[in-house]
Every structure is written in C-alpha cells, then in structure tokens.
C-alpha cells in the first residue's frame, strides 16, 4: 500500500495542479472518485491483475465505462498512467488528490485512536488543539482500541504521534532487551 501511495503521489500532484489551474477541482475530484470506485470493484480488480490483460485494455474499459463523464485532462492522466503501467495506483491517486484538495480548502483529516471512548470535552479540546496546530479545519475520526491500555494515537497525513501506554511499554521492553 505504501508503495502505491509513493507511485501515486506525482500523478496526483500533477493532476491537482492542472485541476487547480483550470478551476476544476470538484470535477476532477468526482471523476477520480468514480474511477477509484470502478478499479476497487472485485471483478475489475481481477480483470486488471489478469496477465493476459494489457494496460491499454484496462484503459479502454475505463474510458468506455465512464463514457462522456471524463474530461480530456483526466483522459490524458489515464493515458500517461497506462503508458507507464501504473493504472493499479488509480485509487491511491484519487486518495492523494483528495488530501491535496482538503489542504487547499484548509481542511485536514485526522484519525484519533484511544483506549476508551473520548468524552465530549476531550473531543472539543483535541479538536481545538489540532485546528491550531495545522491551521486548518480538522475533521476527526475517532476509533477505540482497548489494547492501547490508555492514552491516544493521532494520525494526520504523514504526521503521527503515539502517546499510548502500549507504545511506552513496547519501548521499555525493547530498551530492557538490549
């Protein structure tokens, strides 16, 4: 997965720049989301990994399925990805594009994992702190993981912090083992 994100990033960044210059961020976002949904389908995934199916075959199918719902610039992106045999990273391109769009809109997505359900007051404080840190409107998804024992883990894009008791115990165990 990390490898596909790395492959996808330059395509997504180039697509984002074109979409931004053309004033078509929403249009690109919708088209990439639709393409991502198509390539994520089980049948399509099986088709794409079939050794007898070429990148050009996949490209033709994607263009045929989307028909007139693709603008010429998105078709160009698909052509370049097909030429480089990178259509398998299409979902990740859509994902990175959305991250870039959110940053442009001063929105950031965060995942907060805690050992127990956060209270309303804790959520307010955490939201305010993250909004200030990232100078953006942070959309937080909360998850529970009792294995953390206590504390929280926060992930925002490439930035992460692990303040869980489990992490501290693992570090202590590693230090003792040395």
UniProtKB/Swiss-Prot annotation:
Subcellular location, record wording: Cell inner membrane
GO molecular function: proton-transporting ATP synthase activity, rotational mechanism
Organism superkingdom: Bacteria
Pfam families recorded: OSCP (PF00213)
Entry membrane topology: Peripheral membrane protein
Keyword tags: ATP synthesis, Cell inner membrane, Cell membrane, CF(1), Hydrogen ion transport, Ion transport, Membrane, Transport
InterPro entries with a match to the protein in the record: ATP_synth_OSCP/delta_N_sf, ATPase_OSCP/dsu
GO cellular component terms given for this protein: plasma membrane; proton-transporting ATP synthase complex
Keyword DNA-binding: no
UniProt-listed HAMAP family: ATP_synth_delta_bact
NCBIfam families for this protein: ATP_synt_delta, PRK05758.2-2
General function of this protein: F(1)F(0) ATP synthase produces ATP from ADP in the presence of a proton or sodium gradient. F-type ATPases consist of two structural domains, F(1) containing the extramembraneous catalytic core and F(0) containing the membrane proton channel, linked together by a central stalk and a peripheral stalk. During catalysis, ATP synthesis in the catalytic domain of F(1) is coupled via a rotary mechanism of the central stalk subunits to proton translocation.
Subunit comment: F-type ATPases have 2 components, F(1) - the catalytic core - and F(0) - the membrane proton channel. F(1) has five subunits: alpha(3), beta(3), gamma(1), delta(1), epsilon(1). F(0) has three main subunits: a(1), b(2) and c(10-14). The alpha and beta chains form an alternating ring which encloses part of the gamma chain. F(1) is attached to F(0) by a central stalk formed by the gamma and epsilon chains, while a peripheral stalk is formed by the delta and b chains.
Family, per entry: Belongs to the ATPase delta chain family.
Protein name: ATP synthase subunit delta
Protein's organism: Hydrogenovibrio crunogenus (strain DSM 25203 / XCL-2) (Thiomicrospira crunogena)
